[in-house]
Amino acid sequence: MDLQKLHELIKNCDKCPLHKYRKNAVPGEGEMKLGVMIVGEAPGASEDEAGRPFVGAAGQLLTEALSRLGVRRGDVFITNVVKCRPPNNRTPNREEVEACLPYLIQQIGILKPRRIIALGLISAKALMELMGRRAEKLGDVKGKCYQGRIAGVQVELCITYHPAAVLRKPALRGEFQKDLAMFFGGGLDRFLDPSK
């Protein structure tokens, strides 16, 4: 199956009750020019409206953070574990994650990313479990990368905060940006001002 056919399946999915509340399923978008896939938790209201991932305030923060690293948003594939918006933007439950996980596994199998960046605990837990590992608290795995196989693809899974958490707690912004810099191979050198 190719990505376009998979995304059509996602748009018409009724595997869990979330399909009753959505305006649009949000399969994901972007290219694999850098071999990177970014995986969030679930769409929010803006994403549900647009049918595109990370287009609301959290998406703007992510896009700005990528831009600071010289990374164009369209050069990475961006998606979520859960493809439909949970009511009131609540955290997706286990049933919803399990219903959508086969879609994410298929996306990984088709796109064959070298690196996956998990944003937030729901994404980290789901992807770590696919690698045969566990993640109970984000603090235990945040800022770290793990080697493993998902969908038969050898990947490096790197974990950081979800941008929505950074919006709620702006003190996390620097750490979020540093994690992304490390994950994209830029290290912290990009943030050093040579004039100081």
Curated annotation (Swiss-Prot):
Instruction: Please give a single GO biological process term from the UniProt record.
Output: DNA repair
Check the record and name the InterPro entries matching this protein. Answer: Type-4_UDG, UDG_Type-4/5, Ura-DNA_glyco_family4, Uracil-DNA_glycosylase-like, Uracil-DNA_glycosylase-like_sf
Output the Gene Ontology terms for molecular function.
4 iron, 4 sulfur cluster binding; metal ion binding; uracil DNA N-glycosylase activity
For the protein in the UniProt heading, the enzyme class is hydrolase
User: Is Calcium one of the keywords?
Assistant: no
Which residues does uracil bind? G40, E41, A42, F54, N80, H162
Please summarize the temperature-related behavior of the activity in one or two sentences: Highly thermostable.
Under catalytic activity, the entry for this protein gives: Hydrolyzes single-stranded DNA or mismatched double-stranded DNA and polynucleotides, releasing free uracil
State the SUPFAM superfamilies in the record. Uracil-DNA glycosylase-like (SSF52141)
Query: What keywords are assigned to this protein?
Result: 4Fe-4S, DNA damage, DNA repair, Hydrolase, Iron, Iron-sulfur, Metal-binding
What Pfam families does UniProt report for this protein, alphabetically?
UDG
Q: What is its EC number?
A: 3.2.2.27
Q: Which residues bind [4Fe-4S] cluster?
A: C13, C16, C84, C100
Another remark in the UniProt entry says: The 4Fe-4S cluster may have a structural rather than a catalytic role.
Which family is this protein grouped under? Belongs to the uracil-DNA glycosylase (UDG) superfamily. Type 4 (UDGa) family.
Extract the NCBIfam families matched here. Answer: Arch_udg, UDG_fam4
| PANTHER family assigned | TYPE-4 URACIL-DNA GLYCOSYLASE, TYPE-5 URACIL-DNA GLYCOSYLASE
The job of this chain, per UniProt, is described as:
Removes uracil bases that are present in DNA as a result of either deamination of cytosine or misincorporation of dUMP instead of dTMP. Can remove uracil from double-stranded DNA containing either a U/G or U/A base pair as well as from single-stranded DNA.
User: Per its record, how is this protein called by name?
Assistant: Type-4 uracil-DNA glycosylase
Q: Which organism is it from?
A: Pyrobaculum aerophilum (strain ATCC 51768 / DSM 7523 / JCM 9630 / CIP 104966 / NBRC 100827 / IM2)
